[in-house]
Amino acid sequence: MAKVEQVLSLEPQHELKFRGPFTDVVTTNLKLGNPTDRNVCFKVKTTAPRRYCVRPNSGVIDAGASLNVSVMLQPFDYDPNEKSKHKFMVQSMFAPPDTSDMEAVWKEAKPEDLMDSKLRCVFELPAENAKPHDVEINKIMPTSASKTEAPVAAKPLTSPLDDAEVKKVMEECRRLQGEVQRLREESRQLKEEDGLRARKALPSNSPMAALAASGKEEGLSARLLALVVLFFIVGVIIGKIAL
């Protein structure tokens, strides 16, 4: 005996598409329409009942009316290489006069009175998921380009500025050399003068004479040491510029 053709209209007719990401519940709608002049009972079945929640999953559609069924896919780890084998079936039949006990209605239904339509599930990722990859490429390209252009932009700044700095440092170095030489000569003269004064003013074995002489020597030594340190720093700067 030939199977009765489905009287309900389905939108979509063949596929239920679920668009990710699938880290949360994804819902798609199935619209059932009843173009006939009789009420129609329906129920929705799936090959993977643990993966989906269907509301409403059964009921009665009045003549000329339609109904939206929400199919909710539960979160899962999506693998793009794995094809979905999940399927749905919409089963229907013309409603009997008494529909108060739908469970009994379906149990008592004859196979030749049942109509069904099958839909397969399709998982899709949104196009936006590919955009971060393009953004990363755009970030990498300008960075590498700037690195290659940087040495070209830096070339005009090197020679004139370095020559002027070297001249200034060399002049300062010569001035410091003269200052060091002058302080050495001054230190030598002061030592001689202090020695003569100390011998005239105090006995040679006096502690005061030795203290006065050592104090002046320490002052000159400190100034001389400071100049030597400064001279060393200038030398280091010249060495770096030369490199």
From Swiss-Prot:
One of its GO terms (cellular component) is glutamatergic synapse. Residues 161-196 form a coiled coil. PROSITE patterns: MSP. The record marks K43 as: Involved in binding the phosphorylated serine of the phospho-FFAT motif. It is found in: Endoplasmic reticulum membrane. Ubiquitous. Residues 2-218 are cytoplasmic. The chain crosses the membrane at residues 219-239. GO terms for molecular function: beta-tubulin binding; enzyme binding; FFAT motif binding; microtubule binding; protein heterodimerization activity; protein homodimerization activity; protein-membrane adaptor activity. Belongs to the VAMP-associated protein (VAP) (TC 9.B.17) family. The MSP domain binds the FFAT motif of many proteins. This is Vesicle-associated membrane protein-associated protein B. It comes from Rattus norvegicus. The lineage of its organism: Eukaryota, Metazoa, Chordata, Craniata, Vertebrata. The gene is Vapb.
